[in-house]
Amino acid sequence: MRLLHLVLLVLTLGLLPLRAQELRATVELRTEALGSEGQIHYEGLRRQLTDLLGRTRWTDLAYKEGERINVSFIFTLHERSEAGEYKGELVISARRPIYGTDYMSPTLLLRDPSITFTYLPGDPLTYQETEPEHPLVALCSFYALYVIASDLDSFSPLGGSRLQPRLSALVASAMSHPDWKGWSSTERGLSRARRLEYLTSQEDERYRQCWYRYHREGLDRLSSSPEEAREVLLEVTKELVELRKIRSRSVALSDLEQTKLPELIQLFRSAPQSERLLLSERLRQLFPTAGEQLQALR
């Protein structure tokens, strides 16, 4: 009887959908500026960060293995004090598969220039959903959730909104620590608070709707209906030009310039000249400093 129960349990588990973690994350730690000492400790830190990002279940969504988000975190550390305080920067890049192709579209390429944290060998980096106790855990948690929200936005209209409460609580908790840098909306550059604003403000919802159309109605149809897909992409750029006139400070514009400007240029290289010229004009209005890159569309 016990054997029968075991067999039934195995069969039941086999029928359940496997749930994978959301992120397929890689972590690189660049410490050249800190000298050659302590490399063993840095490798330990890298492994801890990889485990934190790649093994934590960030949401209650059911991801299959093939649906995991490809993302890389590159930490470049510039300074270290004797007390174990580090200063540096973080570059994050994420990609999304395009339906019916082997192409991976960039969905995020951002640089956070002001990361600071204190870390000593052996310090635990344990995820806490509401009130992270370590600035490095708070930093990684925020960007992990932000990457997932951006990915969800690309698959369903405003799909990332479900993570707004989590992100808001995390930012509020981090801002309660005066010595944790990079969280205040008054700091220069694209602080984490400003990125949160992008996901929570009604003013940015139209940008996020464009993000959805660009991916689901544009890129995901390129393999089956390339002409219709390019038409959608041109419609989206027209909408973005109008949005820029009324919402020019949105973080969406900097993210679009980093990820979608090069992509659009490449996608339209072999399009009819009329489409290339129209796209070039709209991208020039969106990104006034991109004139040299746009020469490829002439």
Where are these regions (language model features)?
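Flexible, glycine-rich surface segments
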Residues: 156-249
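Sec/Tat signal peptide C-region and signal peptidase I cleavage site
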Residues: 16-20
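Sec-exported extracytoplasmic/periplasmic mature domains
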Residues: 50-58, 149-152, 265, 269
